């Protein structure tokens, strides 16, 4: 069975595209952060997601590795979508969402990046009152998407996976969902 990583920066609509795509396809949708949290809670290391950041880096690496292994094991019986981030923007710079020790355990077959124009993402972010998102310029949004592309290609180089970009433009959700379905079938 396949392991497909789907990622997009906040406001790209990756979750919306994914939810609509999976209504018609037989994939198990797994959020990588949720699996990490489950493992850390089972081990008695944390009680909630916010406490994950406070764990020593080596413990976090062990949890990341265990989460990737757990997801790969699930793929023996199901096609898996891993909903995660290729890169995480931090005050210190961009952090890889899938370090090599995760990729070695996860063994993804494909990376799908959901993107939109910077203007569309900017507008979506400021109009979404349900989320507390950082305000970024159009150039910063473009840079984040470029970093995702670079990271996805680096990940693909390490794993032999392919990289597909699905555009999710305003008022064209059906088109993005159709393209995503054709990639996953």
Curated annotation (Swiss-Prot):
ATP binds at residues 8-16. Keywords: ATP-binding, Cytoplasm, Kinase, Nucleotide-binding, Transferase. One of its GO terms (cellular component) is cytoplasm. The keyword Magnesium does not apply. It is an enzyme of class 2 (transferase). It catalyses: AMP + ATP = 2 ADP. Its main location: cytoplasm. Its EC number is 2.7.4.3. GO terms for molecular function: adenylate kinase activity; ATP binding. It is found in: Cytoplasm. SUPFAM superfamilies: P-loop containing nucleoside triphosphate hydrolases. InterPro entries: Adenylate_kinase_AdkA, P-loop_NTPase. Belongs to the archaeal adenylate kinase family. This is Adenylate kinase.
């Amino acid at each position: 069975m396949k392991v497909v990583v789907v990622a997009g920066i906040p406001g790209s609509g990756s979750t919306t595209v994914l939810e609509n795509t999976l209504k018609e396809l037989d994939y198990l949708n797994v959020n990588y952060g949720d699996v990490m949290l489950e493992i850390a809670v089972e081990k008695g290391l944390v009680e909630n997601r916010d406490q994950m950041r406070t764990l020593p880096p080596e413990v976090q690496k062990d949890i990341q590795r265990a989460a990737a292994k757990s997801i790969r094991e699930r793929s023996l019986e199901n096609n898996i979508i891993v909903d995660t981030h290729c890169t995480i923007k931090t005050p210190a710079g961009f952090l890889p969402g899938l370090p090599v020790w995760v990729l070695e355990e996860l063994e993804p077959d494909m990376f799908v990046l959901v993107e939109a124009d910077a203007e569309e993402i900017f507008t979506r972010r400021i109009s979404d009152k349900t989320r507390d998102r950082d305000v970024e310029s159009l150039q910063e949004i473009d840079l984040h998407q470029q970093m995702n592309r670079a990271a996805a290609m680096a990940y693909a180089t390490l794993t032999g996976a392919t990289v597909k970009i699905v555009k999710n433009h305003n008022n064209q959700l059906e088109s993005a969902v159709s393209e995503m379905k054709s990639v996953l079938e």
